[in-house]
Amino acid sequence: MMLLRLGPPIGARSVLAWNRSCRVVVREHEERELSALQRYGGCIYATWHQRMFWFFSDFGSRHVTMMISRSKDGEYANALALRLGFYSVRGSNSFNGREALSELIELLKKRQGHKAGMMADGPTGPPRQLKMGSIRIAKETGLPIIPMMYGAKRRIVFKSWDRYFLPLPLTDVVVLHGEPVFVPSDADEKECERLRRLVTDRMNEMADRCDAWWGGEPLGKPGFDLPLKT
């Protein structure tokens, strides 16, 4: 109880301070996002779980809605997300997932200008493979999926299922905005799968570009991952 009360405020301040210490040297194709928001009134941001640390603050500042697990860990994550500026619906692939996804879809339909943020391969993978939930949301709302990726010149890479990483404080960061992807409302199962693979491929290309920006390797190596070139 004490952790749930004190942890999220401290955690939110720490995340914001950490990311604000970094310097965004490139924010590529931001006009794609701005144009989609102006034209369609909302969007579905998609990134990999591996890249989520930066987007805790980036998506939070956009006040996007995320699906967060109803587990005990999810209670803490939800409190932290609210502190960072997110809205949330509660559910996961293993518990209450369909209901939460339907709730998110209805929310996006009703609120002009509302946005969703998806850790598109989370919470347990397989890594860097888009799950069908993002496709379903796009199909039923008519909103575009906008892939978002970031890379850091210096980072800490963990031995997790997806090699989750953190940018080191004071490092340079690059943020890439992908081309919007639409899913027709009459798309059948075959077309949805084609689009799922298309978005997956585009997101992985973006992630690899971020990693190669300063000469790094795709996914990185566990430990302190420093650039091959400065």
Label the predicted regions.
Residues F95-E99, P127, K153:
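Active-site and donor-binding regions of nucleotide-sugar-utilizing enzymes
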Residues M1-S61, I105, D201-T230:
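Membrane-anchoring hydrophobic helices of lipid-metabolizing enzymes
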Residues M1-S21, Y76, R83, R98, ...:
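Alpha-helical membrane-targeting segments
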Residues G42-I44, H63, G113-G117, I146:
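Residue-level preference for the first positions of well-ordered beta-strands
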